[in-house]
Amino acid sequence: MFNNLTQRFLKIIKKISNKGRLTEKNIKETLREIRIALLEADVALPVVKNFIPSIQKSVIGNQVNKSLTPGQELIKIVKKELTLILGKENHSLNLSVTPPAIILMIGLQGSGKTTTTAKLGQLIRTKYKKKVIVTSIDIYRLAAIKQLKMLSKQAKISFFPSNNTQSPKDIVQHAIQHAKLKFYDVLLIDTAGRLQIDKKMMNELLDVYNISHPIETFFVADAMFGQDSINVINEFNKYLPVSSFIITKTDSDTRAGIILSIKYLTKKPIKFIGTGEKLEELELFYPDRIASRILGMGDMLSLIENIENKIDKKHIKKFSNTIKKYNTFNFNDMLLHINQIKKIGGVNSILGKLPKTQTIFNSFQNNIDENILLKMKTIINSMTISERHQPELIKGSRKRRISLGSGIPIPEINQLLKQFNNIKKIMKTIKKGGVTKIMQGINNIIKNKF
């Protein structure tokens, strides 16, 4: 979701980097461009009005580090100020209470609240090692109850049943009693999404809040709603205290306004962000890492954590050995790597966390079609065992047979063979330690995608 803003910042940084030093004139011009970039990204005006003077004060008030270029100095200052606006530090869940710890999920209809409830349940089960149960009090939409039941099964967490003949208060009371009897650590309550601020429904929500005494009341906000969500949040806050936020659909091609505005305007932290549709695509929110991502510096820590949590240690060891013996790399290895890439969120998730230069950014500023991986798998699965082990065997007649078997045209099979050879070259470069050449190699693969 930061693509447009990141591109603007990269251009601004490149422009100031060409200057010999920071002067009052080029600082003023740069701040004007940053202001426009933030407003176009739908960042709230009060946030921008605070942000720009803070940068100006830091640039002019601090002695410029002589070892840094103007561009580096600007990045350092802007990253610091962005981190402050985003929340300064990470706020994690505190589940150190007498069980069950109750979490209330509230928000507008269509924000992804039910899916997020299941995602959070799975994250608490896997990361915090807690016994989790979920329930729905959305008696106005039976599909929501069925959806949560199905998702809870996928997330390997328990589901407490409910139906539209019960009142939300009764469901919550019975769910709490059940959670205590069965020694659950955490109870997640998915509430009915609101289309508007309805007094009757808000009072109903307040009753549930007073009965459950939640340790967290998460407002689930859709990133695509933009800063308009702030007004809705303030209305919710009049009835019951919102404690923190989960921002969903941050993988969408939308502006970053809500993420950059919500903490400053509400004084409540963002704790999680939804980065995709899959249950595992919910991440802890780290303000400093998001600031780095916005400035094109990447988020290598999150990428490393993702790899450590989701990729088999045996695969990492095998990949390391493959690099050492890059000449033995074959299509069986490639198929294994494709499956691992899908595990950590796909190509776009990885690229989104890599550091960017303007050149590299231009190569993948538009999302890469994840179906590329599916095509690759289909082609490889249409090869014989000997062809997978010895790709050099794949010539004219074999290509035609693979094309017929996979239903994919020969030019795209040629493209896969070309990419396979590019990957081998990158492995050779990694072994020799050439980082710049590695990035150029990745850049070439991206440019030559299907």
Swiss-Prot record:
GO terms for biological process: SRP-dependent cotranslational protein targeting to membrane. SMART domains: AAA (SM00382), SRP54 (SM00962), SRP54_N (SM00963). InterPro entries: AAA+_ATPase (IPR003593), P-loop_NTPase (IPR027417), Signal_recog_part_SRP54_M_sf (IPR036891), Signal_recog_particl_SRP54_hlx (IPR013822), Signal_recog_particle_SRP54_M (IPR004125), SRP (IPR004780), SRP/SRP_N (IPR036225), SRP54 (IPR022941). It is found in: Cytoplasm. Keywords: Cytoplasm, GTP-binding, Hydrolase, Nucleotide-binding, Ribonucleoprotein, RNA-binding, Signal recognition particle. GTP binds at residues 107-114, 190-194, 248-251. One of its GO terms (cellular component) is signal recognition particle. Its main location: cytoplasm. The keyword RNA-binding applies. It holds the Pfam family SRP54. GO terms for molecular function: 7S RNA binding; ATP hydrolysis activity; GTP binding; GTPase activity. Composed of three domains: the N-terminal N domain, which is responsible for interactions with the ribosome, the central G domain, which binds GTP, and the C-terminal M domain, which binds the RNA and the signal sequence of the RNC. Part of the signal recognition particle protein translocation system, which is composed of SRP and FtsY. SRP is a ribonucleoprotein composed of Ffh and a 4.5S RNA molecule. Involved in targeting and insertion of nascent membrane proteins into the cytoplasmic membrane. Binds to the hydrophobic signal sequence of the ribosome-nascent chain (RNC) as it emerges from the ribosomes. The SRP-RNC complex is then targeted to the cytoplasmic membrane where it interacts with the SRP receptor FtsY. Interaction with FtsY leads to the transfer of the RNC complex to the Sec translocase for insertion into the membrane, the hydrolysis of GTP by both Ffh and FtsY, and the dissociation of the SRP-FtsY complex into the individual components. This is Signal recognition particle protein. It comes from Buchnera aphidicola subsp. Baizongia pistaciae (strain Bp).
